[in-house]
Amino acid sequence: MSKKFLILLFLIPFQLMFAQKSLLKDFPEGYTPEEIGKRIAYRFLTEKHALHVGKWIGYPETFYWSGALRYADGAKDKELMQRLQEKFDFLFTEEKILQPIMNHVDLNMFGSLPLEFYLVTKDLKYRYLGLPYADSQWELPRNVKPHEKEWAEKGYSWQTRLWIDDMYMITIVQTRAYKVTKDKKYIDRAAKEMVMYLDELQRPNGLFYHAPDVPYYWGRGNGWMAAGMAELLQCLPKKHKDRARIMEGYLKMMESLKKYQNPEGLWNQLIDKSDCWTETSGSAMFTFAFIKGVQNGWLDAEAYAPATRKAWMALVPYLNEKNQVGNVCVGTNKKNSKQYYYDRPCRTGDFHGQGPYLWCAAALMEK
């Protein structure tokens, strides 16, 4: 066998891998992440605040904001970055009252946003604002409830609920605190919490019940888990003791999601129910998890790059001429009723969808 032939055999797998990864780079006009990201990010500048119980910046707005920030950073869009920063800086002055209190996963995750601003700007005021939101998730409040104290005594956040939503809310603020400080306590917390949620909630098919007492595979709930694992694996040191367990859970979930991708290329409100409607926010989160998996080599590019491209191409048509994403499930609490999930209203322009679209766009723009 000639030396040239052996070299060719050696190179073929790499050529195939790069060819598959190129599926996430070459998009037709109107579908490029640069175009889609710009449309959705600039719309954010015109939006009013979406307040949690009418008082504080809510988590959907936080994630829309951070998505716009990621896009601006990736696109090197200085105008957008400046305007996003100016909008946020009102929270230090006349809008300070809108800073969330620190008593719930849905509120503490706000801290991830100023920490993201710090990572981009290196302005210490963002660091000082963001870190207490990460720290207070592991600091017992004076009015702690018995079950919250039990979680804390086991080394988990007292805000633990065993809702799959938590695995983005907790993960995002702890990983951002780790990226800012390099203090391993933050990544250790996030990893320990994730392993426990995997052990408690992941089913044999790789998907997750909304909660232990709600045996339904809700799309966006699973989306929070998928995106949370992708975010954590990006930050988790290669030799971390929990990395193998988290990677196992991630790969198991991705395999199941690939199986349940609907003919359109997206996923349903209840993932395993073919008669349920297509839901875009969860679909965008799954797409984000696929993108990161292919880019980082966690997922086989030959198998997953085509599925990822199909998903992105299917997401874009749900963006209307006003740059609002359609078919977004409204905010949803857990309920042990299949019909409850079927009947949830879907909205156009809901921030639950706007943010994850931007995560995808920013991720696809990465070199």
Predicted regions span which residues?
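Extended ligand-binding groove/face enriched in aromatic
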Residues: 81-86, 94-211, 322
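Bacterial Sec-dependent N-terminal signal peptides
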Residues: 1-21
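Residue-level signal for well-ordered alpha-helical scaffold segments within enzymatic catalytic domains
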Residues: 8, 67-70, 112, 116, ...
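CBM-like carbohydrate-recognition segments
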Residues: 21-62, 69-81, 90, 94, ...
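Short coil/turn segments at secondary-structure junctions
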Residues: 24, 28, 154-158, 181, ...
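Extended ligand-binding clefts on enzyme/binding-domain cores
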Residues: 164-270, 276-287, 299-333, 337
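Aromatic-lined, polymer-binding surfaces characteristic
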Residues: 54-68, 103-118, 163-167, 171-174, ...
